[in-house]
Amino acid sequence: MKTRVAVMFGGKSVEHEVSVISGIQAIMSMDQEKYEVIPVYLTKKNEMYVGEEIGKIEAYKDIPGLLSKSQRVILVNEDDHIVLMPYPVRLFGKKSIEVDIAFPIVHGTNVEDGALQGYLKTIGIPFVGCDVTSSALGMDKYASKVVLKENGVPVLDGYCFTTSDYAEIDSILDKVEKEIGYPAIVKPVDLGSSVGISVARNRS
């Protein structure tokens, strides 16, 4: 009997489109002899959809059209049976799809940072990949740096500044110039990959 895998991709993230590509590439690479793959698309509102076209990359050229011919679902645990249930629930609606495990192929905040993993864990759904804590740590660049450094892994020096700290921007720049120097890499603490990264070569 094949393992039924709900491959989840997309989601409420600035890396939404990259996640769609990653998810479909993962689906295409999975052994169809071992796995019954159920593609699950998460919209930019984190709504879940399944359907015949969900696993086809060309369908994402027209997302409203794709959703109109797909079925919105919710992922639930019914007496230890994991199902993708059509939403809204109707007495004589479409049947639920039973799955064995979820496989999140997601990038960025709101999905890769432990949020989706926490949701899956809360409702008791087995999933592939990092747990909540490691997902959250991996997404927070400064927290990752601190944990690595505390465990003897060589890392470059860095500082984390919040939005409120920018009221003292001159003090921040003084600290950067004194303790790090230029060029300095400036990046959001919790966006994925290289999103938002820039290089500061001087004070201005």
Whereabouts are the PLM-identified features?
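ATP-binding N-terminal substructure of ATP-dependent carboxylate-amine bond-forming enzymes
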Residues: 1-133, 137-139, 143, 150, ...
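Structured loop/turn residues at beta-strand edges in well-structured enzyme cores
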Residues: 97, 153, 180
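Anionic group-transfer/hydrolysis microenvironments
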Residues: 106-109, 159, 189, 203
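Basic phosphate/pyrophosphate-binding loop/patch that engages nucleotide-derived ligands
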Residues: 147-155
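ATP-grasp fold ATP-binding core
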Residues: 148-149, 176-197
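Conserved ATP-binding module of the ATP-grasp superfamily
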Residues: 198-204
